[in-house]
Amino acid sequence: MKRVAYEEMVAQFTRVLEKHGFTPADAKDAAVIFAQNSLSGVYSHGLNRFPRVVSYLEKGEIDPLARAECISRMGSMERWDGHRGFGPLNAQRAMERACALAKENGVGIVALGNNNHWMRGGTYGWLAAEKGCIGICWSNTAPNMPAWGAKDCRIGNNPLILAVPRSDGQHVMVDCALSQFSYGKLESTRLAGRQLPVPGGCDEDGQLTTDPAAIEKSGRALPIGYWKGSGLSILLDLIATLLSGGNAVHTIGTFGDEIGLTQIMIAIDPTKFGTVEENDAVINVILAEIKASTPARPDGEVRWPGEGMLRTIKENRELGVPVVEEIWESVLKM
């Protein structure tokens, strides 16, 4: 397995993005987001997704100079227009604003419409936690999953993120697509030549399968919790569209590529009710209870959400970030 130093990955991404119209500062910030995604083990939304984003820039579907702006506000809630800019930077600024509103009011909400793909949603949940806030955020997507009981794709696997801060930086976070596996995870599993650990969707004959390529071909990803994930997807799309005035899943499906997405950023300041120390104590008791569980397998381990990611970051910092050589070489030639 080839590994690349995190700093080298940032440098190469920065170089390519500057060539495609980003200001030097924005190119560096955007490059850090891509590299951190791979550093965190979410390779599908780091290096592996980078060439696709470059193709969108070349087709003019992403405006590297556009910045999201607030177009209306009420109390601690704001509606922003992303102007089809670079999704991760717009989303980052929106969550930063939600956190600032939360520090003032206890809760801050930014509804971001007309944006582009935000890559890894966990970036923004973690950002909120780093600022001492509970972070809740989600995005809609192009139609890429059938509603429960359907064959054709009319809903999105709209990723949902929840993060809880800890003062030692060991934050607790769930970042999950509403399909059993995100399409990025299907891609990375296929590229690694592996099967999924459990069925992740149906093949073209309607049979459950662990073959990621078969699910990518059929487009029939399985909602998490079956009908529950389907219902949750629909409600998240409704709420996001209503609050932002942006595009719903079915509208995004008419654009060809996955652009013009809608995202919601919610930040809550838990120190409005308890000190940092008091909140840490509550969190630590709950996590200790989880860790005290008896593993189902003798060699197994029970982990809290985000624990595995922190280990991956440490390993990749020390050894280098794993890369698919073909994709990495393509970036070097850009």
Tell where the protein language model's regions lie, with residue ranges.
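Catalytic-core signal marking the mid-to-C-terminal active-site face
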Residues: 3-4, 9, 19, 243, ...
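A generic, well-ordered mixed alpha/beta core segment in the N-terminal half of proteins
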Residues: 77-167
